[in-house]
Amino acid sequence: METRYIEISLDTAKRLYEQGGEFRDIALTAFKEQELIGDRLPKTWDEYCAKHGEVGDRIKASLNTAYMTINKYTFSDYKQAQAHIAKMKLHLLRDDYRNGWKPDWKDGKLGKYVIESSEGECYVAKYIHISSFLAFQDEKTANEFLTNFRELIEEAGDLI
């Protein structure tokens, strides 16, 4: 089999990366994942870790260690432990999506867009005074977060 080498621009590699599968693999042979993600918001936990480089690697390693060291004395069952780790991931991801914004729950004029769950369904709602863990500065950001991390939100369960 003959091997050939191609040149690929960063913009082209970013488009390939977004397509996933083998295209993503091709993009990753030419550029680091951190370069391909750039400043955009992560769509997965792994992208969050890649975006944050060495710090992300340390966070990922710490959470993996937590998974392995959880025992019956810490949580009543493994599902509870997974829910707590999911919430820790959501906390870090949420702060990335907020980009420095923090909700002022005393401000009765400015609405906050929150992700909540009722009867097993997750959705975005607008609140003014009711505090919520997954609160965002605008509806678009809240919906994007919900789309990208619905499974993780469901895994965190009633901790949200």
Predicted segment positions?
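Structural boundary micro-motifs
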Residues: 1-160
